[in-house]
Amino acid sequence: MKDVSISSLENMKLKELYELARHYKISYYSKLTKKELIFAILKANAEQEDLLFMEGVLEIIQSEGFGFLRPINYSPSSEDIYISASQIRRFDLRNGDKVSGKVRPPKENERYYGLLHVEAVNGDDPESAKERVHFPALTPLYPDRQMVLETKPNFLSTRIMDMMAPVGFGQRGLIVAPPKAGKTMLLKEIANSITANQPEAELIVLLIDERPEEVTDIERSVAGDVVSSTFDEVPENHIKVAELVLERAMRLVEHKKDVIILMDSITRLARAYNLVIPPSGRTLSGGIDPAAFHRPKRFFGAARNIEEGGSLTILATALVDTGSRMDDVIYEEFKGTGNMELHLDRSLAERRIFPAIDIRRSGTRKEELLVPKEHLDRLWSIRKTMSDSPDFAEKFMRKMKKTKTNQEFFDILNQEWKQANLSSARR
């Protein structure tokens, strides 16, 4: 019998893997990708030895040295798997690593499953995990690869973002949203665009302090990993889930992967920290402690493009005009930390104009690194022609609806400008 470990399986040709799949009686093996087939073989091999093959996201108990793999929603549950301190040290495992391996059921006096052997770390050979560079040691750069979000002609939100506030791999973006301005619909459109256009990227949707029915809606609408801590959970759980998601994203970036976190919302995460941290003795307007900003800023500031390969993109919503002074202070504190902002306009939403994007106030820093020069010239021309008329956004979107792609929209604008220049020259 051949050696059944992830390193040996990765070195096998597809024909050899198919032979093993037939040996283990795996159904539909020809329809699986190589990575899926490898994990199906590992699982079948474990079951043959009367063991389970399970995986989860590692959370290390710092004071004790051992840890638990969290298989469900990055949160503690009865399905957690115990992993010993010696295994953590041997493979240089870190918080947020997704660890897969053979697991035995709990004995009489035990509460948790026990991990017997580490088969894979973040989908790779565990030995290669030792050679990873730590996330803080990686070199951050400005985003220089555009993440194209345009998909279907009727998805105007993502088409407008590509034009007016382009998103790059490694972007740190704020979606500034008043209530009832279409924030949730926008997040779903962005998530589905990422899934369609960037299938290789790792997408995580993080929902903090949201309504349970909204979580269900997004889980059913989005193909990525949806992680949530609903408003009926304690603030400590919001913080633990958010920090483990960030650690998970960092570990993937260390493996040179492009990771995208869509977060709703940074405002509620900052509120949770304000309730949990020890008081510093100082209070800002709205009743928020200045010390409560440190860890949410660490979360948001982790977004970066990496010179050595990979990137972490964070698009987080910030709530404004909620009637709470604290929410406005939180937005003001985060306003200068991002390198892209997308503003939603409540007045447009009240007039039933969707997407309710404030085109004038939305934009990206260093957009010249993302957008081709000919598109950039057209974009600046559009910005120059923007009037203060409240009907401008409505006219702009009406014109967009008549075109199927952004390229077609730019071509029509070019023709209109040429005709306008000719008529002015004749005069």
From Swiss-Prot:
User: Which species is this UniProt entry from?
Assistant: Bacillus subtilis (strain 168)
- Name under which the protein is recorded: Transcription termination factor Rho
Q: What is its EC number?
A: 3.6.4.-
Task of the protein: Facilitates transcription termination by a mechanism that involves Rho binding to the nascent RNA, activation of Rho's RNA-dependent ATPase activity, and release of the mRNA from the DNA template.
Q: Per its UniProt record, what PANTHER family does this chain match?
A: TRANSCRIPTION TERMINATION FACTOR RHO
Q: Which biological processes are named by the entry's GO terms? A: DNA-templated transcription termination
Residues that coordinate or bind ATP: 168-173, 180-185, 211
What keywords would UniProt list here?
A: ATP-binding, Helicase, Hydrolase, Nucleotide-binding, RNA-binding, Transcription, Transcription regulation, Transcription termination
| Assembly and binders | Homohexamer. The homohexamer assembles into an open ring structure.
Please give the InterPro entries that the UniProt record associates with this protein. Answer: AAA+_ATPase, ATPase_F1/V1/A1_a/bsu_nucl-bd, CSD, NA-bd_OB-fold, P-loop_NTPase, Rho-like_N, Rho_factor_ATP-bd, Rho_N_sf
UniProt enzyme class: hydrolase
Q: Does the keyword Cell wall biogenesis/degradation apply?
A: no
Example of a GO MF term = RNA binding
Q: What HAMAP family does the record point to?
A: Rho
